[in-house]
A protein has these predicted regions:
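Terminal low-complexity, intrinsically disordered regions
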Residues: 1-77
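Short, surface-exposed ligand-recognition loops at beta-strand->loop->(often short) alpha-helix junctions
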Residues: 27-31, 71-75, 98-101, 136-142
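Short, flexible, solvent-exposed loop/turn segments with mixed acidic/basic and small polar residues
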Residues: 53-59, 84, 119-127
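Short glycine-rich, basic-tinged beta-strand/loop micro-motifs
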Residues: 58-70, 125-138
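Short, non-transmembrane amphipathic alpha-helical segments
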Residues: 76-90, 141-159
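A short amphipathic beta-strand at an alpha->beta junction
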Residues: 87-102, 156-168
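Short, low-order "capping/linker" segments at domain edges
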Residues: 104-118
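Long C-terminal interaction/binding lobes of large macromolecular proteins
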Residues: 114, 119-133, 157-166
Length: 168
């Protein structure tokens, strides 16, 4: 498994001087270190997870966001057992997003399995931009819109405005 810290550190849970220096210089975060250690622990028992490439980990409130390569996210989406194992190890809800995805694909990943109908960029008079997302279905879906907005802002600095369009 590839991670932001070296494999020995991920297995031992103690950072070498090189990784410690990267942490001190903010090249990596404590969340990256925590995610690397926990995923490596799972990778010891799971061949699929052992093939993952963790790009970074981000803690958002009580949830954790794992930024992985696209094929790794596909593997996770295809196996609820892997998702359950990872969430059990982390002890919290874990979100999976693709590292090399466009902003549109990133937003679709966050709203998965809900269907995203449209994504539009809205420029505000003060020069800032807002991304308007229209989701198919009912706003009463089991979808934590505020959490998705916070994750998008934290991970990619995208401000979301979410609307629902019900089918008629």
């Amino acid at each position: 498994m590839k991670s932001p810290i070296c494999s020995f550190d991920a297995k031992s849970g103690v950072l070498c001087s090189k990784c410690e220096a990267r942490l001190d210089s903010a090249a990596i975060s404590q969340d990256d270190v925590d995610a690397s250690i926990k995923l490596t622990k799972i990778a010891d028992h799971s061949q699929e997870v052992n093939k993952f490439s963790l790009i970074r980990g981000v803690r958002v409130d009580r949830d954790f966001v794992l930024v992985l390569r696209s094929p790794d996210v596909s593997v996770v989406r295809g196996s609820s057992q892997i998702t359950d194992t990872i969430e059990s190890e982390f002890g919290q809800k874990v979100w999976f997003v693709e590292s090399e995805a466009s902003d549109r694909r990133f937003i679709e990943n966050l709203f998965h399995p809900a269907k995203v109908l449209s994504i539009n960029l809205v420029w505000l008079p003060d020069g800032s931009k807002l991304t308007k997302v229209v989701i198919a279905g009912n706003p009463k879906l089991r979808l934590d819109v505020e959490k998705v907005q916070k994750i998008a802002n934290t991970v990619r600095n995208i401000e979301l405005l979410v609307e629902f369009e019900s089918s008629k």
